[in-house]
Amino acid sequence: MNLTIPFAKGHATENDFIIIPDEDARLDLTPEMVVTLCDRRAGIGADGILRVVKAADVEGSTVDPSLWFMDYRNADGSLAEMCGNGVRLFAHWLYSRGLVDNTSFDIGTRAGVRHVDILQADQHSAQVRVDMGIPDVTGLSTCDINGQVFAGLGVDMGNPHLACVVPGLSASALADMELRAPTFDQEFFPHGVNVEIVTELEDDAVSMRVWERGVGETRSCGTGTVAAACAALADAGLGEGTVKVCVPGGEVEVQIFDDGSTLTGPSAIIALGEVQI
């Protein structure tokens, strides 16, 4: 039986998502539905889906049941713990549609609560700052891409990352690099990993490309930009700082502190409609 449901399409530094409002938790969103909707030829097309639901209606949620919960799904249908770009768009949706009253509020995720501040917003665009928590450095590891081995820093942002700062790599050379699915240490990353290839820190900025677990290469990855900033600062012998992270989809600002991190960047809601699934 076909269901007709409302949706919105949006992106945060061109990491694009389908927003599915499900405030009454009536939709049984299956992996097959997610794959179909995210298909860029046969569906709407997106890097993932953000289902808008209360935490009380999410199985296994450990956050305050009254919070709005970002039920995030990767394009392959798998559940995901956290998405920094997705949180910005999710917060933009909640605020612009009147589902929250304040510009500062909490959002539930599978990685726990994330606090957000709406710095500017209208129905179409926003600038949002997200409290990303303390980056958990898990150690050093490597990956192989196209036969080239990259050494990197394991960083857990609620989801696993391997941020590889490459000595001497320029932004133009990074842009020209052929990025394919990496092979990695599955004992170190038993649940898979998001891999970032990062230039060295220069003038408080880095460039980054990312291969996301369950998706492939994306134009941006919010948690990945925090992992990249953390790795670039460590590579430069620094424990904290503010880093501009340039991704194919735009720019974000990451701040790393002793006791946490923030991610600030844009969000855009570009379409509203209905879809049959």
UniProtKB/Swiss-Prot annotation:
It comes from the Bacteria. The record marks H161, E212 as: Could be important to modulate the pK values of the two catalytic cysteine residues. The keyword Plastid does not apply. Its main location: cytoplasm. PROSITE patterns: DAP_EPIMERASE. Coiled coil: none annotated. One of its GO terms (cellular component) is cytosol. Substrate binds at N15, N74, G84, N85, N159, N194, E212, R213, G222, T223. Keywords: Amino-acid biosynthesis, Cytoplasm, Isomerase, Lysine biosynthesis. Its EC number is 5.1.1.7. GO terms for molecular function: diaminopimelate epimerase activity. It is found in: Cytoplasm. GO terms for biological process: lysine biosynthetic process via diaminopimelate. Disruption phenotype: Cells lacking this gene are unable to transform L,L-DAP and show an impaired growth when supplied with low ammonium but high concentrations of carbon. The active site is at C83, C221. Pfam families: DAP_epimerase. Pathway: Amino-acid biosynthesis; L-lysine biosynthesis via DAP pathway; DL-2,6-diaminopimelate from LL-2,6-diaminopimelate: step 1/1. HAMAP family: DAP_epimerase. NCBIfam families: DapF (TIGR00652). Catalyzes the stereoinversion of LL-2,6-diaminopimelate (L,L-DAP) to meso-diaminopimelate (meso-DAP), a precursor of L-lysine and an essential component of the bacterial peptidoglycan. Involved in the succinylase branch of the diaminopimelate biosynthesis. Belongs to the diaminopimelate epimerase family. This is Diaminopimelate epimerase. The gene is dapF.
